[in-house]
Amino acid sequence: MDAPSRSHLASPILVANYRSLPSFMYRDSLPEAAVSPQLLALNTRLLETLEQDLAWFNSSDALEQLSGKTYYGSNLPFALAYSGHQFGGWSPVLGDGRAHVLGQLKTAADELIDVQLKGSGATPFSRGGDGRATLGAVIREYLLSEAMAGLNISTTGSLAVIATGEDVWRNGAYPGAILVRTAKSHLRVGSFQYAAVHQGPEAVKTLADFALAQYYPELSHDENPYQALLAQVIKGQAELVAQWMLVGFIHGVMNTDNSSITGETIDYGPCAFMDEFNPNKVFSSIDSQGRYAWGNQGAIAQWNMARLGETLLPLLDSDEAKALEIAQAQLGDFNRLFAEHFYQGMARKLSLDASDPELIPFVDSTLQLMTNTRVDFCQFFNALTEYHSTHREQDAGLVALFSTEAFPSLSSTPAQLLQDWLSQWQAKACDSQAALAAMIKANPKFIARNHKVEAAISAAEQNNDYSLFLDMARVLANPYVLAEQDKHYQDAPTPDQRVKQTFCGT
């Protein structure tokens, strides 16, 4: 890759407001220009949502900038600095090792949206890495982030996939690519940790004031704005992680440097959606202890929020004991908020009354049924929705999911366990049209099935065939709409298709 040149052609990408921060929070860094860039995917849905000029993003000028070949005027790209706890271990200096912030887009409502290149070459934070990304890793993030957007779960956006025309060496040669990513913010818990450990409380105050002004201006005039900021980030993370779990999503690397202060899902590495249900399920090849398993994600998010609270202590109160008391009170709210979002979400998925005092034990017993029978997560809720929508007359699809032989550890067959559970559910299920509509809306027809994602990646990497990738992106953008030709995306993997591990491929 070559160094980019400066362009004086008009661009909608503005100078990023991060440059108002102290310079220790970022480093100027030029992308390594792609040798032979090719636009493989442009997310017109996202561009329309952000109210951007489609013509410009389809132009050769856009391809030059988004592939790192040029930058506009004095708008020098940069890499953000941050620290992080990675799998619980402290890393004082991390930062964007393979990403460059180009600037920001402005929406019609004057909201600023970050534009970042991922896989665009080495930065001062690369720590010996090449800063590049494989096409497979870029396709994975594009598909998974589109799936989350389609599910109405807060996420960074994938604006474009650009092939670089060069191979990237990992455990072999793979085609290289750049992901153009958008976000409300790229500030993380790790950003506050970096400010605290390297510059101290005044730097944390500067960063917190920036976050309040840019993302939560309504909190700036609060009696204690820093307490309000902590409370808002906690609230956002509690809701976000509950939403992940309600669709069987496992992030895989919930480090503090991957915990957004604006409540967005960020950094899709070894993430995946579950097929058969297992609360202890992990996919990440490096999560050998199961730290970030599906069922641990709420507790880990709270742990990350505690690390944010530690950085804000000097701002919460001048009295250290009182500051700690304030932080602990806010962190104590996490479990309530998380449980509220999770169990109310499960009530919608099961067409139950959220105010039922027996809701929590019944949901827990449902999850135990799913664990014992290893039923497919998404298919179970879809089959139950179909059964409920036919006035509980057509149960063939539901029964078929539990038609396997008895497991040695169970005293009853899966079919018997289902019937026992169904009798309890039928006594509790709400029959109103509103409840059924909420149930349908809570249970997507499609998730980003791992074996389907891998098939799309394989076709692209091995045969330069992007049709599977683009078709899957289309389906995932509308996961509640089932067309006949798309039904195969609902299929669970056969034993030989099952993806057992995922990797941080970028």
Curated annotation (Swiss-Prot):
Top enzyme class of this protein? transferase
Which reaction is recorded as catalysed by this protein?
L-seryl-[protein] + ATP = 3-O-(5'-adenylyl)-L-seryl-[protein] + diphosphate; L-threonyl-[protein] + ATP = 3-O-(5'-adenylyl)-L-threonyl-[protein] + diphosphate; L-tyrosyl-[protein] + ATP = O-(5'-adenylyl)-L-tyrosyl-[protein] + diphosphate; L-histidyl-[protein] + UTP = N(tele)-(5'-uridylyl)-L-histidyl-[protein] + diphosphate
Please tell me whether the keyword Flavoprotein is annotated for this protein.
Answer: no
Cofactor(s) in the UniProt record: Mg(2+); Mn(2+)
Is this entry keyworded Transferase? yes
Active site (catalytic residues): D257 (proton acceptor)
Which terms are listed as keywords in the entry? ATP-binding, Magnesium, Manganese, Metal-binding, Nucleotide-binding, Nucleotidyltransferase, Transferase
Molecular function in Gene Ontology = AMPylase activity; ATP binding; magnesium ion binding
Give the residues the record marks as binding ATP.
G95, G97, R98, K118, D130, G131, R181, R188, D267
> Which residues, if any, are the signal sequence?
none
Q: EC number(s) on record?
A: 2.7.7.-, 2.7.7.108
Q: Where does Mg(2+) bind?
A: N258, D267
- Pfam families registered for this protein in UniProt: SelO
- According to the record, the residues making up region (Disordered) are 487-506
> Family per UniProt?
Belongs to the SELO family.
- What is the role of the protein in this entry? Nucleotidyltransferase involved in the post-translational modification of proteins. It can catalyze the addition of adenosine monophosphate (AMP) or uridine monophosphate (UMP) to a protein, resulting in modifications known as AMPylation and UMPylation.
Its recorded name reads Protein nucleotidyltransferase YdiU
List the source organism: Shewanella denitrificans (strain OS217 / ATCC BAA-1090 / DSM 15013)
